[in-house]
Amino acid sequence: MSLDEATIQFLKQLGEAGVRPLHEMTPEEARALGGMLGDMYGPGPEMARVEEALIQAEDGGSFGARVLVPAGTPRGVIVYYHGGGWVIGAIDEFDTLGRTLAHRTGCTVVLADYRLAPEHRYPTAGSDAYAALTWAAASLPGLPIVVAGDSAGGNLSAVVALRARDEDGPPIALQVLVYPVTDCDLDNASYTDPENQLMLTRDTMIWFWDHYAPDQADRARPDASPLRAKDLAGLPPAVVLTAEHDVLRDEGEAYAERLRQAGVPVEAKRCAGQMHAFFTMVNVLPGSAAAITTVVEAIDGVLR
């Protein structure tokens, strides 16, 4: 299926605005672009309470988090890790998505503002992500926990689920992996398909990896490339969404299949006509609403 019409028009607008590819920017320039895109999504639903938190990191540093509490008694906690190749992205840009998930699921959402590369390279993002999980478990006790994220945030969700299993960490009811980075192989079929070089390109992924984990040996470790973990048995149930026109499509689907083979319950869906980053484009791309509904229904299923 070709790209849907809304996506075609969105990309046309970006082209007319003269937006350069991310890999031709500095990290600071790329982060500024992310902030501009975030302004397009609107304010999101009202929350009963919004709190800013400071989480202590495992290396002695700290990072922020935003806690979005919907009306009513929370049914669970969603710890959400934003995308951005471990280099860009901030919780302000994902506030609308977080509010939408909180409103639709009745869960408290914790947006983790983990530290970014190249200022904080591998393994900082994964370590911060796990610290956010343990903070949520301690600060919001007694509620089932879902870890979720898109792109690099999907990578962090998978990494956190692996570590929680291995270290007998906080129990995770569900892992939501939206077009996740699961491997450092940049030469599979979805990477080399010209039709997938859209919002995220192979060159941009090289740029992200070079900033985050310049050492090739580090990239191949399971806490950077979870597809390379030897054993995926005993992990929490997973929802894996991929986009048809995305360089990350094949590795996300390969991870879903590995999970299945390990006996993990998996719901996997390839979103037809969609490109990378569509999930977070609330109120901009119609495909976002459909994918969010899939995620909400999966979360409802584990919280019943």
Model-derived features: where do they sit?
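Gly/Ala-rich beta-loop-alpha elbow adjacent to hydrolase catalytic centers
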Residues: 149, 153, 157
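Short beta-strand element of the alpha/beta-hydrolase
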Residues: 75-84
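The serine-hydrolase catalytic nucleophile loop
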Residues: 85-99, 251
